[in-house]
Amino acid sequence: MLEELKEANEYISSKIDKYKSPNLELIKEIEKDAEINNVPIISKEIREYLKFIIKTNKNIKNILEVGTATGYSGIIMSEEIQDRNGNLTTIEIDEDRFKIAQSNFEKSSLKGIEQILGDATKEIKKLNKNFDFIFIDAAKGQYKKFFEDSYKLLNEGGIVFIDNILFRGYLYKESPKRFKTIVKRLDEFIDYLYENFDSVTLLPISDGVMLVSKN
């Protein structure tokens, strides 16, 4: 069974490598840099899923991203809202990554991107606008805090997309001692979402995706 899954993943990966984008060279450059410098960016599977959700939900115009990294996921999402006069607000705590993302955004053909440098646990509260889509991919131990603060800004019918919710698989297999607190918080966060929200799903895509819709 595991061998079949591996073969299936390799097949899927070969297909989604045929990615089309006006910023294709830049995207490839960011992917290469992330691999060399060990920068955490979204997987190709998540990239495709994000694109699909945003592309097919025409009401998504304003997006909040918690965790910019070097701008990879921001570019992917922003491309899908350009013809809607949409806007991306993206928060990053690391100054070096913030600057790299800034450079990457400037190299792209994209408009309507607002970067914020700071701790999302503080910066989200300062935002005075609402969003149709929220993407969370930052410090795993703070996921519940990020969610609670940003959900207040989510428009009716909006979606929260939480990436890496399975945290390298440590939620269902033995984890190193240094990760025990994060694993416990993530496990409790998943229970919290299922207990308090009706439109919730947990999907085994890449390192796990949690979706919450505001109905």
What are the residue ranges of the model-derived segments?
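A short alpha-helical cap/connector motif
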Residues: 1-133, 140-161, 165-215
